[in-house]
From Swiss-Prot:
The lineage of its organism: Bacteria, Pseudomonadati, Spirochaetota, Spirochaetia, Spirochaetales. This is Chaperonin GroEL. Belongs to the chaperonin (HSP60) family. The keyword Chaperone applies. It catalyses: ATP + H2O + a folded polypeptide = ADP + phosphate + an unfolded polypeptide. Signal peptide: none annotated. GO terms for cellular component: cytosol; membrane. It is found in: Cytoplasm. Keywords: ATP-binding, Chaperone, Cytoplasm, Isomerase, Nucleotide-binding. Coiled coil: none annotated. It is an enzyme of class 5 (isomerase).
C-alpha cells in the first residue's frame, strides 16, 4: 500500500494538532467544577463521564497524521491510569503544554535533542521533590478525603472506600460491582473464599439454605485425585477419634470414595464434606499451599514423599469456621501468624517481579485471601447511564486511594506543581547548554497549566490566581469549589503523590517523543470505487437483437 510522508515542521504541526484536539476534549473534565463529556455508543444509551481516560479512549480522528498525535497523547492518559489509577487529565494537560511550548522552540531553530535533555533533567528533579513533599496517610478520615476528591467530590463514595479499606487492610482486595438496588453498599468476605462448592448436596448440614457449616474442623489438603475409599480409610479413622468435622480438598473425588463419604455423612457417622481444589495448573498448587499455610496444615503431595495412607493428624489443617455452599467455600483460619506473614511477603515479591497484569491481579487476590479478606462495593443508581458513570468514579477513587496509601499525599488542586515550579526556579542551571535551559524553562511554565485549567473550568482567569499563589505562603491554594484561599492539606484537598508524579513523568516522556519527531508516515486511504455498474457484464459475443 502507498504511504503518505510528512517531514519536519509539517509532521510536527499535524501531530500537535491531533494532540490539541484530544487535550481540548479531556481538559474540560479537570477539577471540582469540571464539565461532563457525552460519548455516543452505537448500541444503547450514551455514556456520561468526567473521567479523562474514558474520554481519551474514545477519540479517533479522521486525519491520519492528527490521529497519530492523538494516539500518542492517549497513551499518556492510559499509562498514568494503569500506574496510578488517576491523574489522567492532569497528565494530558501537562503533555500538551510541554509539547506546545517545546515545538515553538523547535520551530525557531533550536535543537530538539537538547530541549528534551533539559525537559528530562527538570522532570527528574520535580519527581524527586514530589516524593520528598509527600505526607504519609494513616487515618480513615485522610483515606476518605483522597477517595472523595478522586470520585469528583462525592464524600459518600469516599467514606465507603475508606470503610472498605479499613476493614480489609491495604493489602486486601476491594472489588467494584453493579448493585441490583438503587443503593451503594459494601459486603465483606472474611478469611479465604474460593469458587468451589461441595461435590454432593448430601453433604449439607443446613437443609434450609443447602449449605455445610463446620466449626473447629480439620482440613485434608491433597494434590491428586482420590478415587478409592481404601486410600482415605486411615485418615478418616484418625479424624473419627477426635469427633471433629473434616473438609477434604483434592483435585477430584470420584467413584466409591465419593459414594462412601456421602453415605457416612447422610448416616451421621462422620461430619465430612468434599470439594475440588481451586484454580488451574500451577496456580492450583500455589493456592493449595496458601490454604495449607492459612490453616496450619501440610499439602499432601507425592513430590514431598507424602501419601494419604501415611497422613498424621498433625498434618491436617484446622479452621475456626468453614462454610460451603453449591458455589463457594469460605475458610476462617487459625494458622500460624508468622508463617502467614512469610507467605504474604513471598507473594508481594512475586507481584513486584511479575510483568503480566493478569498474573498481578491473581497474585493480589491470593494475598488478600491470606491477610485480610475481600470487600465488595456494590454500586447502585437510578438509571443505567448514571450507574456506568458512578461505577467509573468508584473505580477511579479506589485506584487513587491505593496510590495514596502507597506513596503518601501532596496538596491538591495543582498547587503542588506550582510549588515544584518555584523549587525549579532555585536550581542553578548555569552548567546547562542553551537548548537544555530552554527545555528546563518549558517544564517550569507547563507546571502551571493544570491549576490554570482547574480555575478556568470554575469560570475564572487562571493567570491572576497563579501569580497570587506564588506570593502566598507555602501550602496555600485556591479551592475551586468554594472560591476561597485555603490550606490545601487542612481542607482535605489532597492528591496522591504517585498520581502527581506519574502524570508529570508520563507527560514529559510523550512530549519528548513529539519534539524529536522528524518524519511521520501513514497509509494513503484508497478511494472506494463509487461508479455504478450493477448487473452482469455483457458477453462480448452477444450482439443487439
Amino acid at each position: 500500500m502507498a504511504k503518505d510522508i510528512y517531514f519536519n515542521e509539517d509532521a510536527r504541526k499535524s501531530l500537535l494538532s491531533g494532540v490539541e484536539k484530544l487535550s481540548n476534549a479531556v481538559k474540560v473534565t479537570l477539577g471540582p467544577k469540571g464539565r461532563n463529556v457525552l460519548i455516543d455508543k452505537k448500541f444503547g444509551s450514551p455514556t456520561v463521564t468526567k473521567d479523562g481516560v474514558s474520554v481519551a479512549r474514545e477519540i479517533e480522528l479522521e486525519n491520519p497524521f492528527e490521529n497519530m498525535g492523538a494516539q500518542l497523547l492517549k497513551e499518556v492518559a492510559i499509562k498514568t491510569n494503569d500506574v496510578a489509577g488517576d491523574g489522567t487529565t492532569t497528565a494530558t494537560v501537562l503533555a500538551y503544554a510541554i509539547a506546545r511550548e517545546g515545538l515553538k522552540n523547535v520551530s525557531s531553530g533550536i535543537n530538539p535533542i537538547g530541549i528534551k535533555k533539559g525537559i528530562d533533567h527538570a522532570v527528574n528533579l520535580a519527581a524527586e521533590k514530589i516524593r520528598q513533599s509527600a505526607k504519609k496517610i494513616t487515618t480513615k478520615e485522610e483515606i476518605a478525603q483522597v477517595a472523595s476528591i478522586s470520585a469528583n467530590n462525592d464524600s459518600y463514595i469516599g467514606e465507603k472506600i475508606a470503610e472498605a479499606m479499613d476493614k480489609v487492610g491495604k493489602d486486601g482486595v476491594i472489588t467494584v460491582e453493579e448493585s441490583k438496588t438503587f443503593d451503594t453498599t459494601i459486603s465483606y468476605v472474611e478469611g479465604m473464599q474460593f469458587d468451589r462448592g461441595y461435590l454432593s448436596p448430601y453433604f449439607s448440614t443446613n437443609k434450609e439454605n443447602m449449605s455445610v457449616n463446620f466449626d473447629d474442623a480439620f482440613i485434608l489438603i491433597y494434590e491428586k485425585k482420590i478415587s478409592s475409599i481404601k486410600e482415605l480409610l486411615p485418615v478418616l479413622e484418625k479424624v473419627l477419634g477426635t469427633n471433629k468435622p473434616l473438609l477434604i480438598i483434592a483435585e477430584d473425588i470420584e467413584g466409591d470414595a465419593l459414594a462412601a463419604l456421602v453415605l457416612n455423612s447422610v448416616r451421621g457417622a462422620l461430619k465430612v464434606c468434599a470439594i475440588k481444589s481451586p484454580g488451574f495448573g500451577d496456580r492450583r498448587k500455589a493456592m493449595l499451599e496458601d490454604i495449607a499455610v492459612l490453616t496450619g496444615g501440610v499439602l499432601i503431595s507425592e513430590e514431598l514423599g507424602l501419601t494419604l495412607e501415611t497422613v498424621e493428624i498433625e498434618q491436617l489443617g484446622q479452621a475456626k469456621t468453614i462454610k460451603v455452599d453449591k458455589d463457594n467455600t469460605t475458610i476462617i483460619n487459625t494458622g500460624n501468624k508468622e508463617q502467614i506473614k512469610e507467605r504474604s511477603e513471598l507473594i508481594k515479591k512475586q507481584i513486584e517481579d511479575s510483568t503480566s497484569e493478569y498474573d498481578k491481579e491473581k497474585l493480589q487476590e491470593r494475598l488478600a485471601k491470606l491477610v485480610g479478606g475481600v470487600a465488595v462495593i456494590n454500586v447502585g443508581a437510578v438509571t443505567e447511564v448514571e450507574l456506568k458513570e458512578k461505577k467509573h468514579r468508584v473505580e477511579d477513587a479506589l485506584s487513587a486511594t491505593r496510590a495514596a496509601v502507597e506513596e503518601g499525599v501532596v496538596p491538591g488542586g495543582g498547587s503542588t506543581l506550582i510549588e515544584v515550579a518555584m523549587y525549579l526556579d532555585t536550581i542553578d542551571t548555569s552548567k546547562l547548554s542553551y537548548e537544555e535551559k530552554q527545555g528546563f524553562e518549558i517544564v517550569k511554565r507547563s507546571l502551571e497549566e493544570p491549576m490554570r485549567q482547574i480555575i478556568s473550568n470554575a469560570g475564572f482567569e487562571g493567570s491572576i490566581y497563579i501569580h497570587q499563589i506564588k506570593t502566598e505562603k507555602k501550602g496555600l491554594g485556591f479551592d475551586a469549589s468554594s472560591f476561597k484561599w485555603v490550606n490545601m492539606i487542612e481542607s482535605g484537598i489532597i492528591d496522591p503523590a504517585k498520581v502527581t508524579r506519574s502524570a508529570l513523568q508520563n507527560a514529559a516522556s510523550i512530549a519528548g517523543l513529539l519534539l524529536t519527531t522528524e518524519c511521520a508516515i501513514t497509509d494513503i486511504k484508497e478511494e472506494k470505487n463509487t461508479s455504478g455498474g450493477g448487473g452482469y457484464p455483457m458477453d462480448p459475443g452477444m450482439g443487439m437483437m
